[in-house]
């Protein structure tokens, strides 16, 4: 069962196209303060040399349009990530999200192996060490 979501141009993205990659889905919205707090460290994580096999998809589950999300990223000086969209809320339902931010990690075989509920510091050394063992 393929997991799909949209990019900023309304193109459908399928996680199946990223088999063999370490995948991080981060569910967020522009009105969510903790999401705003963690996004810069998530951005840095995408450019971490130890995690060259990592692909991060920040998926907006709010009612925010692409423009609003782009401005949100620009204001936070996000350079390594692009906003994606869960429209209509398929993934939020599929994963039974209870709140945001929620981060879900998938190994190279596409299996979920971890879930972080609430905001986190993605630049934490222990977290990066742990994650790089899946890279």
Q: What is the predicted role of each segment?
A:
Residues 1, 23, 100-101:
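Short loop/turn microsegments at loop-to-beta-strand junctions
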Residues 1-15:
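N-terminal "domain-start" segment that seeds a small globular fold
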Residues 14-36:
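Short active-site neighborhood of thiol/selenol oxidoreductases, capturing the structured segment around
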Residues 18-21, 51, 78-80, 97-98:
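Active-site acidic short loop of glycosyltransferases
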Residues 26, 58-60, 115-117:
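Soluble periplasmic/extracytoplasmic beta-strand elements of cell-envelope proteins
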Residues 36-76, 87-94:
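Structural microenvironment flanking redox-active thiols in thiol-disulfide oxidoreductases
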Residues 71-79, 86-132:
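Thiol/disulfide oxidoreductase modules built on the thioredoxin-like
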């Amino acid at each position: 069962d393929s997991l799909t979501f949209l990019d900023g141009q309304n193109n459908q993205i399928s996680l199946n196209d990223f088999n063999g990659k370490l995948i991080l889905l981060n569910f967020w919205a522009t009105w969510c303060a903790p999401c705003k707090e963690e996004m810069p460290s998530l951005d840095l994580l995408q450019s971490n040399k130890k995690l060259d096999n990592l692909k991060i998809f920040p998926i907006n589950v709010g009612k925010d349009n692409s423009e609003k999300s782009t401005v949100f990223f620009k204001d936070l000086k996000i350079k390594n990530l692009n906003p994606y969209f869960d429209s209509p809320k398929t993934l939020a339902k599929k994963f039974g999200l209870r709140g945001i931010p929620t981060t879900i990690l998938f190994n190279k075989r596409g299996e979920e192996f971890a879930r972080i509920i609430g905001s986190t510091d993605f630049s934490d050394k222990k977290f990066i060490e742990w994650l790089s063992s899946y890279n």
